[in-house]
Structure formats: C-alpha cells, structure tokens
Amino acid sequence: MHDFCFTIPYGMLLIGGGFIGYMKKGSITSFAGGAGTGLLLILAGYISLKAFEKKKNSTIAMVLQTVIAAALTLVMGQRYLLTGKIMPAGLVAGISALMTCFYVYKIATGGNKFPAKAE
C-alpha cells in the first residue's frame, strides 16, 4: 500500500477532529493543531502522490509524514496518560502510533513500489 493512500485520509481526520474540538469546546488550540498537522500531512501526501506518478519516491514527504505522526503520538500519548481520556487524546495517539509504524516500515523497505510495466 502506498503512503499517500493513508496519509491524505489521516490528514483529513485530524482536520475534522480539530474542527469538532473547536465546535464543541471552542478550543482554538484543537482547531489550529488539527488543521496545521492535517494540512501538512495532506501536503506531504500530495507531494508523495505526484512523485509516485513520476515513478519516484519523495524522501521529504516520507520524513515529514513520519515526524508529524511521531510527534502526535508523543504529544497526544502524554495527554492521554495525564487525562485518561480516550477521546480525543487516546484515539489520536493510537492512530498516530500506527501511522508512525507504517511510515517507518515504508522507509525501511525503500518507499512506494511501482507496478511492473505490462507489455
């Protein structure tokens, strides 16, 4: 599976979560954090997709995706440990941990694989 197939929906999920946090609690921090990280992930996913279309891998996109997911895992994991609340901290920490593992796997295996050219 290609990284951008998960990265773009992951970014949209973070934006949506930040928006919901803002609407329910009036939290500008939730909105800014969700929108900021979500938009960066969508941008990284888009860069990766465009590189894939050229049969290349984007190291910058892979590193950016990994760093953001790892940072969210740490920040939201700490928040979960302090509050014990599954929503949103535990959920975001869990999803981000899975995404971090996925990105590390993609980096370790050489990035996106390209389909063989049919003759």
UniProtKB/Swiss-Prot annotation:
For all TMEM14 proteins, 4 hydrophobic alpha-helical domains are predicted. However, NMR structure determination of the human TMEM14A showed that only 3 of these helices are membrane-spaning while the amphiphilic N-terminal helix is probably located at the lipid micelle-water interface. Pfam families: Tmemb_14 (PF03647). It is a multi-pass membrane protein. Belongs to the TMEM14 family. Keywords: Membrane, Transmembrane, Transmembrane helix. The chain crosses the membrane at residues 27-47, 57-77, 84-104. May be involved in free fatty acids export. Gene3D superfamilies: Transmembrane protein 14-like (1.10.10.1740). The keyword Transmembrane applies. The keyword Transmembrane applies. InterPro entries: TMEM14 (IPR005349), TMEM14_sf (IPR044890). It is found in: Membrane. This is Protein FATTY ACID EXPORT 6. GO terms for cellular component: cytoplasm; endomembrane system; membrane; nucleus. Signal peptide: none annotated. It comes from the Eukaryota. The lineage of its organism: Eukaryota, Viridiplantae, Streptophyta, Embryophyta, Tracheophyta.
